[in-house]
């Protein structure tokens, strides 16, 4: 797997994924985020088995593939990098490298095979409903918080 994307774009989505992940997981794989690169799109997934997050961002896919990496470390590395394009590559032995394009910086993380990542359960169609933005805002404005 190899893909290139803009640092700020992926960092924003990884930040949201990190909020989903609990700091005290019973399974170590739940501290990871799943990255699936194919057809010029990167799918990012995170779960704590109760709440799940999935998003897609446009990327330049050189080689399609999938892996999972420790979300907190990935986010820390992304925050330390300068803005611009970043190359992500999965190498031998699930070694996941992160390299800013045109910079001589190289980070490596150990990935875990994606087949160990739990499947995200989707709600059935009958559990969804549509709500206008105005109605939603009106309901939120009528909410009272008690302490």
Regions found by a protein language model. Give the residues of each.
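Structural preference for solvent-exposed beta-strand-turn elements
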Residues: 1-147
């Amino acid at each position: 797997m190899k893909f290139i994307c803009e640092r700020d774009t992926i960092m924003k989505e990884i930040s949201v994924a990190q909020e989903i992940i609990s700091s005290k997981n019973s399974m170590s794989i739940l501290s990871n985020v799943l990255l699936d690169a194919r057809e010029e799109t990167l799918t990012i997934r995170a779960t704590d088995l109760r709440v799940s997050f999935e998003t897609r961002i446009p990327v330049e896919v050189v080689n399609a593939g999938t892996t999972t990496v420790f979300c907190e470390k990935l986010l820390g590395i992304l925050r330390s990098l300068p803005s611009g394009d970043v190359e992500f590559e999965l190498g031998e032995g699930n070694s996941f490298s992160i390299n800013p394009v045109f910079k001589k910086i190289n980070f490596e993380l150990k990935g875990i095979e994606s087949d160990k990542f739990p499947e995200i359960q989707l709600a059935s169609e009958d559990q969804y409903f549509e709500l206008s933005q105005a109605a939603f805002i009106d309901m939120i404005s009528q909410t009272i918080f008690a302490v």
